[in-house]
Design a protein with these regions (language model features):
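Alpha-helical recognition segments enriched in aromatics with Gly/Pro capping
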Residues: 1-182
């Protein structure tokens, strides 16, 4: 809300659970899946990448399987002109593999998918990770930044008009700048 961002739709990872099986079947039908030590992979070595792991040896799906299903669903549902994945740079190989597998599946729109990489966000010397329980909520961070701006305004310019709105703009702007700069 503080950023003025709205979403037309929102789907979590589990939304794609029933869409992964058909993707695996399609990969099989197109002759792209190969067995490697019990796991199912798409060989990407001819393209200078390690194999794309689709199913673990126990049959479990992986992020790549889910992302393939999600990409196809989004194209089928929204018929996008461009699909941007704004994700940390550490996931660069994952997205190169994703886009290459989509291309090998014959999806010409794979060229319209792009990974927009950014640096990892850290707080108090640790990289944030939801899986590892190191989380700072954006709402909390924005409110802290606004409060800091409010405090500085009170100290330096107590007679300033529209202090609350200016503190909001400065606090939110500082957080946005920090994330984009880093």
């Amino acid at each position: 809300e503080l950023l003025g961002v709205t979403f037309d739709s929102y789907a979590g990872e589990s939304f794609y659970n029933d869409k992964m099986g058909p993707i695996v079947e399609e990969l099989k039908e197109k002759g792209l899946l190969k067995e490697d030590k019990g796991a199912m992979i798409v060989d990407l070595e001819p393209y200078g990448m390690p194999p794309a792991l689709i199913l673990r040896s126990d049959g479990a799906t992986l992020y790549l399987t889910r992302d393939l299903a999600a990409a196809k669903y989004r194209k089928d549902t929204y018929n996008f002109d461009k699909s941007l994945y704004v994700v940390a740079y550490q996931q660069d190989l994952h997205f190169k593999q994703l886009f290459k597998v989509l291309e090998l599946m014959g999806y010409t729109w794979a060229k319209d998918c792009e990974h927009v990489a950014f640096g990892m966000v850290s707080y108090e010397g640790q990289t944030l990770s939801t899986r590892e329980g190191r989380v700072v909520y954006l709402d909390d961070l924005l409110h802290q930044a606004i409060q800091k701006a409010r405090d500085i305004i009170e100290e330096k310019s107590p007679a300033l008009e529209n202090k609350e709105e200016i503190a909001r703009q400065i606090g939110v702007g500082a957080v946005v700048f920090f994330v984009l700069y880093n």
